[in-house]
Amino acid sequence: MEFTELFKLIYENDIDTLEKARSEGVDFCKTDVYDQNNLLIAYAGSGYDKRYQPEDLIDFLLHCGIDINHKRNKRGGELAALHVAVSKMNYRIVSHLIENGAEIDIREINGNTPLWIAVMNYRGQENMIQIINLLVSKGASLDLINYHDRSVKDIINTIGGGIDAGHNKKEWDLRHLLK
């Protein structure tokens, strides 16, 4: 069974059907040929919850042997499931990935961590500030420098300077994290 067929199976079926497929030898650890995306990363970007809870499907995939910290190849930006869930602002998936051992400061192709992505994309959204607070409470670093010599603190201070100058909205201010 190919990757796209597996992803369709995940989208269309319930856990019982997925368990049956696994017992019949279906390999859920496959990746797509283009960017080495795995089913956990693909699911983290979509977060379907029509037939089952996201936590149930993540647990199923992890029990199938999927590496929670698997990253896409360079073509895919070396993103892990945690990066993708953060960028999609899906708190439930972010939280469950962290609870199950996702590396909190995993880096993508530019050296950016999930917290860096969250801060960079934050524009006052309630679910994103919850993700930022969760990442910080779980030990995500504000000080790690990416491959372009920028840290989360740098981004927070740059946005804060824009707020002080009247260029950015006040609700974007995250400088309270630096205290």
Q: Positions of the model-derived regions?
A:
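Alpha-helical adaptor scaffolds
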Residues: D67-R75, L79, H83-D105
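Ankyrin repeat domain, specifically the short helix-to-loop turn at the C-terminus of the second helix
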Residues: E19-D27, L57-I68, S95-E103, I131-S141, ...
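Ankyrin-repeat-protein effector appendages
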Residues: M1-E5, I129-N133, S137-D143, Y147-K179
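Alpha-solenoid repeat scaffolds
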Residues: F28, K50, I68, I104, ...
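Ankyrin repeat A-helix N-terminal signature
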Residues: K8-N13, A42-Q53, V84-N90, I117-M128, ...
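Conserved binding-pocket/active-site segment within a compact domain
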Residues: R107-R123, N127-L134, K138-S141
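Ankyrin-repeat boundary/"N-cap" motif
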Residues: E2-L6, T31-G47, K71-V84, R107-M120, ...
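Terminal domain-start segments
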Residues: D16-V33, N37-G45, C64
